[in-house]
């Protein structure tokens, strides 16, 4: 894809499936030049098509991040929108039985990965006339639930990072938005339950959950507001979900 310096550039992490894929496509259709990053390069290439660049990215690996950002710099010279979407949940064990590996895995991606990518992209965000950082949080960043301590703690951290970024970037033309979805049917639960599709399907039993396009629509809304308007956060959940742990299910 030949770079067009007049069109805005949107970087989306975790773009091989789910919310990341839907967001890359939605922004591409709105005229953004897309740079989509993910570990599963073949899948992210299929997602992006002719909307932009598909590049390998592992947010737990600083060398991978540096190479990725270097490619963006060479192709476009700036980033107008950064969507920190890469994230995951692992397990539902109570704290008394918590797995170090699960907790480390979630924090490496959800928290440190977000920090590393944001840090590496900041010089290119500052090159844009108006930059925008969109962090994928969760309603789990506002609440807690049994068995979810590792994940909810990581999403509380995302909320803290987003709020701190607004303080640190105050006075600069860079907006910060946190998107906090509730129940969204994607590969999320399949990953959480280590590929157990029945357990993943049971999460959505008797409920019409959100889908990835619902979240992508919120992201498009936030980034297309006038430059002086900063949507701090959007909390979105299916009507059947009143809290992380309270869902009205139909038999």
Where is each model-derived feature located?
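Residue(s) in the substrate-gating loop at a strand-loop-helix junction
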Residues: 138
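Active-site helix of classical SDR
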Residues: 118, 154
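Alpha-helical segment proximal to the catalytic Tyr-Lys
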Residues: 123, 167-170
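C-terminal helical subdomain
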Residues: 178-182, 197-245
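Substrate-binding pocket helix/loop in short-chain dehydrogenase/reductase
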Residues: 93-95, 102-104
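The beta1-alpha1 cofactor-binding region of Rossmann-like NAD(H)/NADP(H)-dependent oxidoreductases
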Residues: 57-67, 100
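Conserved glycine-rich cofactor-binding loop
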Residues: 16-17
């Amino acid at each position: 894809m030949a770079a067009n310096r007049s069109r805005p550039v949107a970087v989306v992490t975790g773009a091989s499936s789910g919310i990341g894929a839907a967001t890359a496509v939605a922004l591409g259709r709105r005229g953004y030049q897309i740079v989509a990053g993910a570990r599963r390069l073949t899948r992210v290439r299929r997602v992006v098509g002719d909307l932009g660049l598909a590049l390998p990215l592992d947010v737990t690996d600083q060398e991978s991040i540096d190479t990725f950002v270097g490619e963006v710099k060479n192709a476009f010279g700036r980033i107008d929108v950064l969507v920190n979407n890469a994230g995951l949940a692992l397990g539902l064990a109570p704290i008394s039985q918590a797995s170090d590996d699960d907790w480390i895995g979630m924090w490496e991606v959800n928290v440190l990965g977000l920090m590393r990518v944001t840090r590496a992209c900041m010089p290119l965000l500052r090159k844009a006339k108006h930059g925008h950082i969109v962090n994928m949080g969760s309603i789990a960043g506002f609440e807690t639930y049994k068995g979810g301590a590792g994940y909810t703690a990581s999403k509380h951290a995302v909320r803290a990072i987003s709020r701190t970024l607004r303080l640190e970037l105050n006075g600069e033309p860079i907006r910060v938005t946190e998107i906090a979805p509730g129940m969204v049917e994607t590969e999320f639960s399949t990953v959480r339950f280590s590929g157990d599709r029945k357990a993943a399907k049971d999460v959505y039993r008797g409920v019409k959950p959100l889908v990835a396009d619902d979240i992508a629509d919120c992201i498009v809304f936030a980034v297309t507001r006038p430059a002086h308007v900063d949507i701090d956060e959007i909390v979105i959940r299916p009507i059947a979900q009143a809290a992380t742990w309270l869902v009205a299910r139909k038999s």
